[in-house]
Amino acid sequence: MKYVVLLGDGMADWPMEALGGRTPLQVARKPNMDSIARIGRCGLARTVPEGMTPGSDVANLSIMGYDPRRYYTGRAPLEAAAMRIPLGEKEVAFRCNFVTVMDGIMDDYSAGHITSEEGAEIAESLKKVIPGGRIYPGVSYRNIVVLKVCRDAVCTPPHDIMGKPISDHLPRGDDAHILIDIMERARPLLEEHPVNRRRVSMGLKPANMIWLWGQGPAPSMPRFHEIYGLKGAVISAVDLLKGLGVCAGWRVIDVPGATGTIDTNYAGKVRAALEALGSVDLVYLHIEAPDEAAHSGDVEQKIRAIELFDERVVGPMIHGLERSGEAWRVLLLPDHPTPIEIRTHSTDPVPFAIAGSGVCVDSVDAFDEISASEGGYGMIEGNDLIRLLIAG
């Protein structure tokens, strides 16, 4: 038996007046996802335990079969694992976003999706403002900073405060002044940086501030195969997902042209997933684009991202599995909702569908938040999804 998790990040949403009281999933043309719902069994999953922040880190850890209340230590250490960054016993990893702040307002959590090359050039120049720490450039606006302090500071994700004053959301608590000092000392350097001068001259958003958040020590997790007896692989453009794969003992597959945006290499991801199933039992295929569109507040882009996920990932993946001649099961879902209305994540349960060999079919005939609520699985905890997928 081969298993595939098809995950559209942030696809779930709330009913919108602009869409006639429907959600983007209900409006989007998605024949392949609807087909999985028809030939499979649906339900709703609480991927974010009560009291935890609805980040992609918590939600995906849960979907992978780990209880976040037991194993979660922070987002940044997972991304550090993906980047093979060593963390000492007393070291703490922080996510360091390049952001755009205008008149004290968080204008863009990604600095206009600055390129990785530009980000690396800026990161190199920031080493002087992080005494006793280290900075590692990642993909686009994402970087990792390693410090030996501030483990218990309260930090806010920048995508949660789009359009809001940053002064209300600066780090708080023990040693938070150290983080604020680093962020403030970087600002004059960033304002004068050649990369930002070029970006402004081209009408692009500058990376005029850094934002530290998501901190934690290195996680300690049992390997996936030790729990479930299966070998796994993960395919994603996002370091967070790769880091989860590293911590789970999965094979991490890099696909050229995988961008984490709507123009990603969909065909390359599907091809890599089908090839990987020749040597592993389960592939976790993650697409970031719907979430990025939702954070930007662009409902049409989110609908388009959902449709591309359906057309270029879900359809070809099912076709490839059917041609393989092997028994298979698929789990289809988002990790969390990212409602356009609030432009950040929510804790609402997400729709899911499991289809394939030996799955008992229910009466649901469409894949969306409302239809899945009538599914045969009912409401379950997110960390039980993998067990359901294996059990059928």
Swiss-Prot record:
> Which keywords, in A-to-Z order, does the entry hold?
Glycolysis, Isomerase
**Which CDD domains does the UniProt entry name for this protein?**
iPGM_like (cd16011)
- Reaction catalysed by this chain? (2R)-2-phosphoglycerate = (2R)-3-phosphoglycerate
- What is its EC class? isomerase
In the Enzyme Commission scheme, what number(s) does this protein have? Answer: 5.4.2.12
Metabolic or biological pathway:
Carbohydrate degradation; glycolysis; pyruvate from D-glyceraldehyde 3-phosphate: step 3/5
Q: Which GO terms describe its biological process?
A: glycolytic process
Which GO MF terms are attached to this record?
Answer: metal ion binding; phosphoglycerate mutase activity
Homology family? Belongs to the BPG-independent phosphoglycerate mutase family. A-PGAM subfamily.
Q: What does this protein do?
A: Catalyzes the interconversion of 2-phosphoglycerate and 3-phosphoglycerate.
Q: What is this protein called?
A: 2,3-bisphosphoglycerate-independent phosphoglycerate mutase
Q: Which organism is it from?
A: Methanothrix thermoacetophila (strain DSM 6194 / JCM 14653 / NBRC 101360 / PT)
Q: Gene for this protein?
A: apgM
